[in-house]
């Protein structure tokens, strides 16, 4: 499975006291290992990552196939488990990919430049100080995206919503008569949660990518929920012993790969009529 920064750092510095930051709430603890749990938000120890001077995310320009995005505030929780399952298929199929847990990055809210005037919202984004410009460039460079999302109040997480809001500058290219960067790319959507809201969450996410010109892979959405009548503390055991979440996740990732390999984007180039809001 994907090695976390925590696991890599522990192996390299087994006895060194370092600061550990909770990726959920930002609490910092100093020690040889992270605490057993966060005293502020009660997240387990695997949500801690080694704290270091922040460096802005950059993109080296190297082309790759698929972006795998974990949109949960809990980088190693149940949504992270679903992302792990997806990542295993990507490795097995030998496609090039990059995985991102959004809680590890700094993504500011959208400035809504479009509300001032349409031409003010353009690519590259005017906010160049956070990690989103690199994400923009990778969305343009990759062939497909797989979004893994939790269900929060019958919708996606706030982190993922802000990420998707920040793709407005790419969508708006079609409105200001500039060449688009995303039409014909492929999308797949994976959703998990404690209770209801899976279909709505998936559709909210899909609407964003549809407006960017993405093509949803056939059978490109999968979701799994546990149930409100269970205590949420039992969710992790349920998901990690559930055969359906494994089968459906693997199916969606396979379908994204197969659709991507048809080179639909290249075949549709110059033939699409952008229809966006």
Q: What do these predicted ranges mean?
A:
Residues 4-14, 26-27, 42, 50-177, ...:
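N-terminal beta1-alpha1-beta2 submodule of the flavodoxin-like/Rossmannoid cofactor-binding fold
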Residues 176-222:
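Short, glycine-/small-residue-rich phosphate/pyrophosphate-handling segment
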Residues 16-18, 34, 103-106, 183:
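Short metal-coordination and nucleic-acid-contact micro-motifs, chiefly zinc-binding Cys/His arrays
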């Amino acid at each position: 499975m994907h090695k976390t920064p925590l696991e890599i750092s522990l192996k390299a510095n087994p006895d060194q006291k370092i600061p550990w930051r909770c990726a959920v709430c930002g609490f910092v603890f100093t020690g040889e290992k992270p605490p057993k749990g966060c005293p502020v938000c009660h997240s387990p120890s695997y949500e801690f990552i080694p704290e270091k001077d922040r460096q802005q995310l950059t993109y080296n320009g190297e082309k790759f196939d698929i972006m795998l995005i974990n949109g949960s505030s809990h980088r190693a929780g149940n949504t992270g488990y679903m992302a792990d399952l997806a990542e295993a298929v990507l490795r097995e199929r030998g496609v090039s990919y990059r995985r991102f847990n959004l809680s590890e990055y700094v993504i500011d809210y959208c400035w809504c430049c479009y509300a001032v005037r349409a031409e003010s919202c353009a690519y590259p984004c005017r906010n160049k100080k956070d990690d989103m410009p690199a994400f923009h460039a990778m969305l343009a460079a990759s062939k497909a995206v797989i979004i893994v999302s939790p269900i929060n109040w019958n919708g996606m997480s706030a982190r993922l919503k802000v990420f998707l809001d920040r793709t407005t500058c790419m969508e708006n290219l079609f409105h200001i008569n500039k060449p688009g960067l995303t039409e014909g790319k492929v999308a797949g959507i994976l959703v998990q949660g404690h209770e209801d809201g899976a279909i709505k969450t998936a559709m909210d996410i899909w609407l964003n990518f549809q407006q960017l010109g993405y093509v949803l892979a056939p059978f490109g959405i999968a979701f799994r929920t546990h149930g409100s009548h269970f205590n949420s503390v039992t969710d992790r055991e349920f998901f990690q012993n559930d055969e359906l979440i494994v089968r459906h996740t693997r199916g969606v990732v396979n379908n994204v790969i197969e659709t991507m390999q048809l080179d639909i984007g290249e075949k549709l180039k110059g033939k699409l009529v952008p229809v966006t809001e």
